[in-house]
Amino acid sequence: MKPGIHPDYREVVFQDMSNGFKFITRSTIQTRETIELEGKTYPLAKIEVSSESHSFYTGQQKIMDTAGRVEKFKNKFGSRASGKVAK
């Protein structure tokens, strides 16, 4: 491998924001945040879903905030989202 052209492959902590679960793995992800875990400082990558919170792995169904998404869409696009296609 050529020196200086590859990203830094290092240990990183990934934190599931839905339940706080943290795990250490190796990654090339770039992040500014750090966290101290097990007496050592690691870069921190925040993720929305992991195997600890995804319904496929947990077997539990979670209700997502789809109503908030619909309202946000309606506020953003208003009458343009009437369903009619302009020709």
From Swiss-Prot:
InterPro entries assigned: Ribosomal_bL28/bL31-like_sf, Ribosomal_bL31, Ribosomal_bL31_B, Ribosomal_bL31_sf
GO molecular function, one term: structural constituent of ribosome
Example of a GO biological process term: translation
GO CC terms, sorted: ribonucleoprotein complex; ribosome
Protein keywords: Ribonucleoprotein, Ribosomal protein
Keyword Ribonucleoprotein: yes
SUPFAM superfamilies: L28p-like
Entries under Pfam families matching the protein: Ribosomal_L31
Xref: NCBIfam families: L31, PRK01678.1
PANTHER family associated with the record: 50S RIBOSOMAL PROTEIN L31, CHLOROPLASTIC (PTHR33280), LARGE RIBOSOMAL SUBUNIT PROTEIN BL31C (PTHR33280:SF1)
Family listed: Belongs to the bacterial ribosomal protein bL31 family. Type B subfamily.
Complex formation: Part of the 50S ribosomal subunit.
Protein name in UniProt: Large ribosomal subunit protein bL31B
Upper taxonomic lineage: Bacteria, Pseudomonadati, Pseudomonadota, Betaproteobacteria, Burkholderiales
